[in-house]
Structures are given as C-alpha cells and as structure tokens.
Curated annotation (Swiss-Prot):
Functional note: Catalyzes the formation of phosphatidylethanolamine (PtdEtn) from phosphatidylserine (PtdSer).
InterPro entries: PS_Dcarbxylase, PSD-B, PSD_type1_pro
Residues modified as Pyruvic acid (Ser): S252
Any one annotated GO CC term: plasma membrane
Taxonomic lineage of the native organism: Bacteria, Pseudomonadati, Pseudomonadota, Gammaproteobacteria, Vibrionales
Name under which the protein is recorded: Phosphatidylserine decarboxylase proenzyme
Amino acid sequence: MDKIKVGLQYWIPQHGLTRLVGKLASAKAGSLTTAVIRWFIKQYNVNMDEAKHSDPKHFKTFNEFFVRELKEGARPITEGDEIITHPADACVSQFGPIEDGQLIQAKGHNYSAQELLGGDEKLAEEFKDGSFATLYLSPRDYHRVHMPCDGTLRQMIYVPGDLFSVNPLTAENVPNLFARNERVVCIFDTEFGPMAQVLVGATIVGSIEQVWAGTITPPRGNTVYKWDYPAEGDKAVILKKGEEMGRFKLGSTVINLFAKDAIEFDVSMENGQPTVMGTPYALKK
C-alpha cells in the first residue's frame, strides 16, 4: 500500500492539484468555509486555545485559519545570545553534520547541499562540513516560520521544482525529495556565520510567503530567481530572533544549514521529536 501511495504521486498533476486547492483555500465561502475549518480542527486535533482567534467563524477563508496568529505569549522565545531557537512548531525529521556536501533525507537517502541551494556551488561551500536540520510541519501545526537567531538577509532564491508530499513516507521513498521540490532559500548573515533557512513546498502547498516580499509562489516558474539584499539602509532586511520570517499555506518543511563549527544542536534533540517554536534548538559554539 505504501508503494502505491508513493507511486501515485509521480502520476497525479501535482501543480494543477495544488493550484486548485490553493484557489479553494482562499475562497470566501461563508458557512461552508466555517464547516471545513471545524472538520479540520476535529480531524487533526488542532489546539485552538492558543490561537488569537479561537472561533472558526472569525476566519473568512481556510487560508486565514491555516496561518492563524497565536495569542501573545503563547510561544515565549528562550533568551540568551548563545541560544538558537526552533523556527517552527514541527517534528525533527533529520539532523546532523553535512558530510561530503551531503544531507541525510532518510535512511538510505542523501541529497546534496548544492542542489538544495539551487545549484549554487559557491554558496554551498559556505556550509561545507557544517550542520543541518530538517523540520516537518504537519497539518495540525502552527504554520508561521520564525527566525532562530538574529540575522541580516543577504539573498533569497526561488527554486522551481516538483510538488511531492514531504511526509515521512515520501521522504523514505522519493530520491532527492527536498532538492527536487519547489523551495524558497533564504540566506542570512549572523553573528556565527551564514545560515540558510529553506522553505520547501509540497503537494497542495498553495503558497510560500516571506514577510519582506509577500507571496513568492505562486505564480510558479521554471527558472531559478535570485534577489540580493543590502546589509544596511532602507532596503536592508534585519530580523531578530523569534520574529516571523515566512509562512506556508498549506504546510511543509523547513531546512536549516549552518556553517562549520558554528553551532551545536541541543543535547535533547532527536529524530521524531516534536518541536515548539522559540524553545532551544542549538547553541553557538
């Protein structure tokens, strides 16, 4: 059955299905929208007590519900300049060293940092022998993505690609999953060197947005696009630890890359572990 589920993803019209779901999720359908939201909350056991607006009737579209804001103080950010915090509510898929330019996708499946970063060899060199972590956001999770540390945006890269599901089953069976799916790569300069925060698209992920640029996708393209940002001035994008940097409509995966000898992951971190945005993720070395 698992092979059938994975095999079907090669045949379904991924982009067409995603466009359709995106349109439906952004539609203002009144009581029907409310009914769908109520079903989703029950189906995925979504905790609405921590949402700023807990009544499903508040949301005019499903997307508004999906990127719901939390109550003030619901995600306190762990203080300390040396502490890097989790960027999202998620589940740890994989983490560890980047060896020979390769990241672990799942047992028996690796992929290259260079491919993940849109084929940029020079950029990939900045993370040679560094560290990575892959965080999977499930449907029930809070789907805003935040900064794990203070950072100044240097570059944003849109990389076109497929839209396979990114759940654990697919990660274990589709080669180069995260390097073949559509993604938005954000490169930040930090006190401990470069950091990449990559937002990976997936089936029915209708939109990836950034706080400084709005919606990056859709529309979906066939070309890698790059935007460079200044370190100073009116056009500089400087974000503090815990600040929102992007969001998914509907959810997917966040991948972080860190430079060599820059960080050490929290000793309690392990694969399959749920994460809470703002809690300890790593320590600066």
